[in-house]
From Swiss-Prot:
SMART domains: FYVE, PH. May play a role in early endosome fusion upstream of RAB5, hence regulating receptor trafficking and fluid-phase transport. Enhances cellular sensitivity to TNF-induced apoptosis. The FYVE domain is important for binding to the endosomal membrane. It comes from Gallus gallus (Chicken). This is Pleckstrin homology domain-containing family F member 2.
Length: 249
């Protein structure tokens, strides 16, 4: 089915429309063999709060961006190679329902669909695309992924020392290894995580100690799936993705 659509006029036209919606700031998406499988609006759990994002699933990449004008204009394009993607379902809790984790070596995050059916369709299609890619390349699924960041709203005090209260002056930081929200004194060290950056990145003292002694898997297990067990914030929308990163770090 996918191979048959690859060179069809309809597929080429659909991809061209997506390119036009992102404009000159977006990357070209039309390449031989690429097929647009589906698209839709998902709620992405960003650092500050959940936000609506437009997602496009291709047979080899997942693309998403900010919605400026629905079906007409998007910005801040992100492209994720599906070959490195793994996904895990998230239990429903509060206003956040029908969600799953999208995990990659460079970045991991949670998204939520409007209905359980939509969630199932997205997950099935993503898994099928990943499986087909790995089958063709002969590669094995990636077992390394970046931590999912705990949203700011879920931590009023540092998740490491459990003492420092966050204020406009004592601001929040995120450990790039475990994803915890931590204070400045608990995250003064940096460590090179090649899958995330070519430069050393901010990590918490706990992860630094484990990484320095070579216990990287132990460090990851401290994060575990605590994200899916922590309380969730209410749904909101915003116009940009600036708060996905610690801009000052």
């Amino acid at each position: 089915m996918v191979d048959r659509l690859a060179n069809s006029e309809a597929n080429t036209r659909r991809i061209s429309i997506v390119e036009n919606c992102f404009g000159a700031a977006g990357q070209p998406l039309t390449i031989p063999g690429r097929v647009l499988i589906g698209e839709g609006v998902l709620t992405k759990l960003c650092r500050k709060k959940p936000k609506a994002r437009q997602f496009f699933l291709f047979n080899d990449i997942l693309v998403y961006g900010n919605i400026v004008i629905q079906k007409k204009k998007y910005n801040k394009q992100h492209i994720i190679p599906l070959e490195n993607v793994t996904i895990d379902s998230i239990q429903d809790e509060g206003d956040l329902r029908n969600g799953w984790l999208i995990k990659t070596p460079t970045k991991s995050f949670a998204v939520y669909a409007a209905t359980a059916t939509e969630k199932s369709e997205w997950m099935n299609h993503i898994n099928k695309c990943v499986s087909d890619l790995l089958s063709k390349s002969g590669k094995t699924p990636s077992n390394e992924h970046a931590a999912v960041w705990v949203p700011d709203s879920e931590a009023t005090v540092c998740m490491r020392c459990q003492k420092a209260k966050f204020t406009p002056v004592n601001r929040r930081h995120h450990c790039r290894k475990c994803g915890f929200v931590v204070c400045g004194p608990c995250s003064e060290k940096r460590f090179l995580l090649p899958s995330q950056s070519s430069k050393p990145v901010r990590i918490c003292d706990s992860c630094y100690d484990l990484l320095s002694t070579g216990e990287m898997t132990a460090c990851q297990s401290t994060r575990s799936d605590s994200y899916s067990q922590s309380p969730k914030s209410s749904l909101n929308d915003a116009s940009d993705d600036d708060d996905d990163e610690d801009s000052s770090d």
